[in-house]
Amino acid sequence: MVSFLDRPPTEFDLILDPAKLNSAAFFSNDEFRAVLKSLIGDLKKNQRPNYFNSLVDQMINVYAHISAGEHADALVRIIDATCVVVTNLPSNVFLKKLKTNKFTDSIDYLILPHFILWDYNFVVFLNNTFNSKHENSLVDISGALQKIKLTHGVIKDQLQSKNGYAVQYSYSTFLNTASFYANVQCLNGVNEVMPPLHSVRRYFGRDVPHARAWTTRHPNISQLSTQVSDVRVNDRDTDWNVKVGLGIFPGANTDCDGDKKIITYLPRPNSLIDLECLLYGDPRYSFICFDKNRLTFVSQQIFYLHKNVEAVERLLKTMPLAFALWRIHANVKFSARLELLLRDFCLVASSNASYLLFKQLTELIKDEEMVCADEELFGLSGQFTDMVNSGAKGSAALIESTRQYARTRATDIDIVSTRATTSLNSYISSHNKVQVCGADIYHNTAVLQNLYIKNNYICYKNDDRRIASICALPSEYLFPEHLLDLFIE
C-alpha cells in the first residue's frame, strides 16, 4: 500500500522581518487611506495649486494657515522615511498575479518611493486607487477566473499567462523614476531620441549638453532591441511626445504607431555604465548585433532612397570602397541591397564608417514627402507599385488580394464566415507557434553557448570534445567570401 503525503507549498514573502528595515514608514491599508484622504482634502484648500510647485511647497502653503490635525505625525513619518510601505493590501487595490506557480510570491504590500519623488498627480492617483467609491472597482481576476470553466485552451492560456499582471504597470510609471514613458513619433534620424524637455531637466536637474539614454519598446522588453541613443534636446517645452530616430529599430522589431517607448537616462558624469553601453549598445562601436545590423532603414526611408537612387549612387561614387561594395550586390532587391551595403561596409571599414554612411543617406531624404492621390486610393497603383518595386513593403500578391477583398459583397456569407474562421485559427496557431519557437530559441542558445572554435576544430564544453572540423561550418558563420576576395585582390 503506497500513500502520498501532501507537501506544503513553498511560499516567499520577501519582507521577512519588517522591524529590521531602517527608516521605512509602515502603514496598514486603512491607516494609509485615512492619511491620503485628509492630505488630498488639505491640498485642495491650496490657493495656488501649481504643477511646477513641489508637493512640499504646496504643503507649506496649506499648513502655514491651518494645522495638520490628527495626521500630522503620519505625514512627518512619510516625509522622513526613505520609503513608505503599505501593508495588508486587499486585492482590489493591487491585483494578484493571475497564474500561481511554485515561485509566485504572496506579496500583499506596496513599496512607495521617497516622498521627494511624489507630486500632486501621484497623490491624486493613490487616493483614487485606495479610496475608490466602489469597493470592487477592480475585479480580482485570478479569483474570478478560477470559477469559470474556459473550454478553449488557448484563450485560457492567454488570460492566465504568467506575465499577466492586471494593474501593476500603472504604478510603474510613477515608481520607476529613472524612466519616462511617452508616445512615439518618428524622426528621420540615426541613433537619437528627442524626449520631452522637462523629462531631461527633471532627471538631471539642470541643462545637460550631451546626454545618452537606453530606449526600449514597452510591450515585451527584450534585450535585443534595447539601444543606447543620443539624446537631442527638444526646443519646444510643450511637446510631451518622444521622437525616435527611425534607424534605431533593428529590423522590424518596432512598429511605432503610438507605441510606448521607455527611456532610461544614463547617469552623468559619464560612468562605467556609460562606457559599457558605448561598447555594446552603440552602432558607432558595434554596428552588427548577432546577425542584424544595429541601424536599419524603415520602409518609408527605403522608398525615398529608391526614388532618389541617382543621388544615392552619386554619394557612393565619392567613396570608392562603398561604391565597389554597392556594385557587388547589383542584382539584389533594393531594400536588401542597402542592408548588405551597410553590413559589408562595416566589416571592411568600421562600425563608425557604416554609422556615418547611414547618417549621410538619411540626410539625402530629409525633405521628402509622400502624397497619395486618386490613383493610389482607388486604383492601388502609383506609389504602391513603387513601394513594392523598392522592396520596402508589400508585394504584388498583397495588392491583388486587397483588390479581391474590396470586391467581396456583404451578401457573400460563405466567404465572409470562412475568412473569419481562418483569421481566428491563424491567430490561435500563431500563439502556439510563439511558445514553441521561444522554447526552440532558448534550447539553441543553451547549446550554442557551449560551442567554440579552437585549433581549427569545433569544440563542445572542453578542448577534448571535438565535434567536427571547422570546414563543416556553413559559410553564413564565417566572414563573407566576397569580402575576402576584395582583400586578396
Swiss-Prot record:
Lipid metabolism in keyword set: no
Pfam family membership, one: LEF-9
GO terms classed as biological process: viral transcription
The keyword Transcription regulation belongs to this UniProt entry's keyword annotation: yes
Key words of the record: Transcription, Transcription regulation
Protein purpose: Involved in late/very late gene activation.
Entry similarity comment: Belongs to the baculoviridae LEF-9 family.
Protein name: Late expression factor 9
Organism per entry: Orgyia pseudotsugata multicapsid polyhedrosis virus
Taxonomic lineage: Viruses, Viruses incertae sedis, Naldaviricetes, Lefavirales, Baculoviridae
